[in-house]
């Protein structure tokens, strides 16, 4: 029987773009759900705002 995978694909969405009415940028990445149980927050580049902003994991 195959083992259950620990890595899952997640989507990161910009938090500041919604406040300003711009289209939110989204990034796709993977995370290990055994080591990182809480939601991931990274600082990534948003091309519509032309600056680095916080991106939070969405479902």
Swiss-Prot record:
<dbReference type="GO" id="GO:0005737">
    <property type="term" value="C:cytoplasm"/>
</dbReference>
<dbReference type="Pfam" id="PF00471">
    <property type="entry name" value="Ribosomal_L33"/>
</dbReference>
<dbReference type="GO" id="GO:1990904">
    <property type="term" value="C:ribonucleoprotein complex"/>
</dbReference>
<keyword id="KW-0687">Ribonucleoprotein</keyword>
<dbReference type="GO" id="GO:0003735">
    <property type="term" value="F:structural constituent of ribosome"/>
</dbReference>
<dbReference type="GO" id="GO:0006412">
    <property type="term" value="P:translation"/>
</dbReference>
<dbReference type="InterPro" id="IPR038584">
    <property type="entry name" value="Ribosomal_bL33_sf"/>
</dbReference>
<dbReference type="GO" id="GO:0005840">
    <property type="term" value="C:ribosome"/>
</dbReference>
<protein>
    <recommendedName>
        <fullName>Large ribosomal subunit protein bL33</fullName>
    </recommendedName>
</protein>
<dbReference type="InterPro" id="IPR001705">
    <property type="entry name" value="Ribosomal_bL33"/>
</dbReference>
<comment type="similarity">
    <text>Belongs to the bacterial ribosomal protein bL33 family.</text>
</comment>
<dbReference type="InterPro" id="IPR011332">
    <property type="entry name" value="Ribosomal_zn-bd"/>
</dbReference>
<keyword id="KW-0689">Ribosomal protein</keyword>
């Amino acid at each position: 029987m195959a083992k259950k995978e620990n890595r899952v694909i997640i989507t990161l969405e910009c938090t500041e773009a919604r406040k300003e009415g711009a289209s939110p940028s989204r990034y796709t990445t993977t995370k290990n759900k055994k080591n990182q149980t809480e939601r991931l927050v990274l600082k990534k580049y948003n091309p519509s705002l032309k600056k680095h902003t916080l991106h939070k994991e969405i479902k």
